[in-house]
Amino acid sequence: MNSLRIARAALRVRPTAVRAPLQRRGYAEAVADKIKLSLSLPHQAIYKSQDVVQVNIPAVSGEMGVLANHVPSIEQLKPGLVEVIEESGSNKQYFLSGGFAVVQPGSKLSINAVEGYALEDFSAEAVRAQIAEAQKIVSGGGSQQDIAEAQVELEVLESLQAVLK
């Protein structure tokens, strides 16, 4: 019962406290137009808290562009293209097989992925050949485990093929 009285006392507002002027933040302050990107794979860090202008990610909820001062969120990534627009204006593209992106307050973006490679490292012909192999296994050429693994492989390869076109 004692704690209830303390809570009620905390709700009472003294008239002098209400009359105190509120300080407002001015809009003349410079707004940061960069986002600090960390893009990490198990074997390397591609970006280590580097300033970039924009990052486009393939979230499960839909394609998403992340700019400075973006709303904080956590996104699961599907296999697809991550596009990084750097300060110099250059555009770097990476294919990730999946992972997570965390947009944090203070214009910070952390992307963690199991696999990721520069898009230029892929061969469209090799991807087509691997898709054909995976399709053979999915259509009944192996155990249930082999078929399940081939289905996952096929999903990733088809996403990669769509990006390479």
UniProtKB/Swiss-Prot annotation:
Entry's localization field: Mitochondrion; Mitochondrion inner membrane
UniProt keyword terms in alphabetical order: ATP synthesis, CF(1), Hydrogen ion transport, Ion transport, Membrane, Mitochondrion, Mitochondrion inner membrane, Transit peptide, Transport
MF (Gene Ontology): ATP hydrolysis activity; proton-transporting ATP synthase activity, rotational mechanism
First and last residues of the transit peptide: 1-27
InterPro entries assigned: ATP_synth_F1_dsu/esu, ATP_synth_F1_dsu/esu_N, ATPD_C_fung, ATPsynth_dsu/esu_N
GO biological process, one term: proton motive force-driven ATP synthesis
Transmembrane segments: none
Domain of life: Eukaryota
One CC-aspect GO term: proton-transporting ATP synthase complex
Entry similarity comment: Belongs to the ATPase epsilon chain family.
Quaternary structure and partners: F-type ATPases have 2 components, CF(1) - the catalytic core - and CF(0) - the membrane proton channel. CF(1) has five subunits: alpha(3), beta(3), gamma(1), delta(1), epsilon(1). CF(0) has three main subunits: a, b and c.
Entry function: Mitochondrial membrane ATP synthase (F(1)F(0) ATP synthase or Complex V) produces ATP from ADP in the presence of a proton gradient across the membrane which is generated by electron transport complexes of the respiratory chain. F-type ATPases consist of two structural domains, F(1) - containing the extramembraneous catalytic core, and F(0) - containing the membrane proton channel, linked together by a central stalk and a peripheral stalk. During catalysis, ATP turnover in the catalytic domain of F(1) is coupled via a rotary mechanism of the central stalk subunits to proton translocation.
HAMAP family (UniProt xref): ATP_synth_epsil_bac (MF_00530)
The name this protein goes by in its record: ATP synthase subunit delta, mitochondrial
Organism whose genome encodes this protein: Neurospora crassa (strain ATCC 24698 / 74-OR23-1A / CBS 708.71 / DSM 1257 / FGSC 987)
Gene: des
